[in-house]
Structures are given as structure tokens and as C-alpha cells.
Amino acid sequence: MISFQNVSFTYAESGNGGVLDLNLIVRSGECVLLCGPSGCGKTTVTRLANGLIPHFFHGNLSGQVNVNGMDTRETEIAALSDAVGTVFQNPRTQFFNTDTDSEIVFGLENQGIPREALRSRLDELTEELHLSELRGRNIFELSGGEKQKIAFSSVYASAPDVLVFDEPSSNLDMKAIGELADLIQRAKISGKTILIAEHRIWYLMDIVDRVVYMQDGRIASDMEAAAFKALPEADIRRMGLRVRDLSVSESGGVKTIAADGLLSVQKISVRLGGRSVLNNLSFQASRGEIIAIAGVNGAGKSTLARMLCGLQKNGSGTVLWAGKPMSRRLRRKKAYMVMQDVGHQLFTDSVAAECALGIKAPNKDEIDRTLEKVDLLAYKERHPLSLSGGQMQRLAVVVSDICGKELLVFDEPTSGLDLKSMEEVGILTRSLAAQGKVLLIITHDIEFMMRICTRILFIRDGEIVKDLSGGQKEKIVRLLRGEE
């Protein structure tokens, strides 16, 4: 059981994202969904539950948090971690090894489990969680979704009584989300106490027992799952939540300015670690197009993005712009990539400075206007790395607008974003397309995909297997679920 009694917390470095007068009980064996707009306090609640507050994140804490009878303030983090397993939004933050096998059993190894028992447990997990393709791999060569699977497997291996998830689906494809849902359901059936903070809520509707909606650090409503599912769709939108059912996702991407084949990708191939990641991949893109690059985790999407931007060293094939071949160096000048792990491309000490980086005569008024479009103007003097994950994503998209590049590649730009932030990124993306830029968006986010994309390219085993228009919703959903 998890119990929060009159809990308030503010972070030492910032007044944002804390909680006020939190009273909540998650009963043993119960599965509870925490939802609400970005910055409402969901992640703070998960950190209170697993003891990272106050043992790692410092600030002003009052009230009492108990997990399985342990006061988190008085209990050492090592003891809490035996009882509470956490899967974070960014799995890289919880890795301790460079290979997948060692990472999966790392927690068990630290409990002193004999080597033979470790091997046996690893084999059990491989079958139960469908990990055979991830065994013996270099963690740093995995896709974002594959890393998330390894993080979950490592936590699941230690069999804690309480499982805490912070945006666990943010980097997963639809098929993997379905597998995650099955795992959560299995954990629930086995009696685990589960707390999940999520923006993508559709896959949890048949699993959770209760839905706790947060706003401005407080619990605005706490209802049974059936009551939440009965709410009108208009209420869900007013609450700033994503769809509960994918069938109501909006569709209607922007129209292409001209079918000019400005970008031509011809027979791109890449091998990594002895594996063929891209295999003779070819396609064309026109000015003003917004093309989604979709496919299961590990299909080669991020590798394709790096090739197009001149960031992938090895590989073969040709990339043409207006009929002229582009070297890696020219691609780096022509293209801009918003990375999936966006913290790696933010370099300055303020949001405003980040927007002006590398620009000879930055237009401060233009920077302010663009920041205002995505609700970041109030943070212009903040350090970029002090922003939330969603805010950093939006900042990187803003920088891509200001820098004036013609080929823009976004790798999961809506990962971890709430409805409002997703819509803001969509508006900015549409405006970039209207300027005649070519946009390629690697995404698993079907809501975002259906709203703005003109085409969807499906990659499987390093090859394009389908090229569909954005309006073919039912076919797109079937492909994303692995049903075709």
C-alpha cells in the first residue's frame, strides 16, 4: 500500500512541478493512473512513492509518505528500492551496464543471487517478456523503445511489491505498448500495487482501477475507472487529456505545397554491429510535406534520421537535394535534427541563448514570438536542462524553426507531451511546412501522426513496406499494431 497524508513538496531549485496538500491511498493490489497536464505534479508523486524525494531530489517536504508500512523519509533508499521498482520516462537514467543481459539481472545480482539462479531467471524472463532479440546486445545500440523494454525487464526481474511507472509508453511503438499493457495486467493479477503517471492513457483503460486527475499540484478528481470512461469526450479535452480511445483520434494532415521531389533518398544501406539496419531504402519527399516515419522499435527509423542529417558515419547510398547529391557535410548544413534524447543537444545557460546559438544577428522579437507559441516565453531566462522533458522537446522544435534549415527531422517530438503541448508542437510543425520546408517525423504517436502528417512511411527490417496518405486511419492503426 502507498499512503500520502497531507503531503506538500516544492523543489529547492524551482517552485514548479511540486504538490500541495496531497492525500491519496493506493491500496495493495490496486492499479492507479495519475494523469493531468504537464507540470501538474504527476512525476513528483512517483518520486515521493519511490523515495527519490527526499533522498535524491531536495526541497521543502511536509506530511507523511508510507510505502508498505515504511516511512519514506526515515527509511534508507536501499530498503525502499527492494519494495518499490520504478521504470522512468528516460531509461538511460537507470542503466548501470553496457550489455542487456547484465542489465536485466543487475538488481538480482546485487541481492546476492547465485550465478546459476541468475542464468535461470534470465532465461525465464526472456521467454515471458519476449526478449530473445534483445539478449546479448550493446545497450547503447538499442532504439529508445528497446531501452525501455530492458529497463522494465530489469525492474520486473527483482519482483518488487510496488511498481511505479513514469510515462512508460513514451518511446514505445503500438505493438510494444500492447505488450507493456499485458505485462502491467499480469503484474496486477499477481497482486502488485501499481502507480502509473501517463499522458497516453488509451492503452490503460481496461487495466486501471482508479484514475487520479491532477492540476496545479493538487488532486482535482479521484474516480473509479468506470466513471472516468463514462465522461464525455468534450470533458476529456477540457481537462487537457489525450484520447481514451484511438478510434476518436482526429485525422486530416496538411496539404503538400508542391510534388517536386525536392529530397530524394536512393538505396540507403547501413550495417551496425554486424546487423543490417537499413537495406536499400529509397523514397522522395516534396516541399511542404510532413512525413511520418513509423515502424516497430529497432526498425531503423533513428538510423535513417542520422543518415539524412549527415550524422551517421558508416553507410552507403545517395541523398539528393533538388537533384544534386549531398555529402555528409552538406547534409549537416542543410538539415536540423531534434533528437529523441533532446538533452544532448541543448548547450547554453538559458532558453533565450539556446534560441540564438549560432545565429549571427538573432532577432530577439522573433525569438520571443516563437517561444510564446509553445508557452515557453516565461522560461526564457531558465537553464534549458532545468525544464521538464516536454518543455525541452518544445524548445528544440523552436530552435529548428529559428535556425532556418530546410530539411527538418524530428525524432519523437511529442514523447512525454500532454494534449496542449502536443497541439502546440503540431501548430509549429504546420507553420514550418507552410514555409516550404521538408519535415520528416519519426513517431509512434498516432494522435500526432493522424493530426498533421501528409504521408506515413512504414519501415520494417530496414525497408519501406508501406507508403500511405495521412487519411487512411484504419489501415494505419492496423499496421502500427502489427496486424498487417
State where each predicted segment sits.
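Helix-to-loop junction immediately C-terminal to a conserved catalytic motif
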Residues: 50, 309
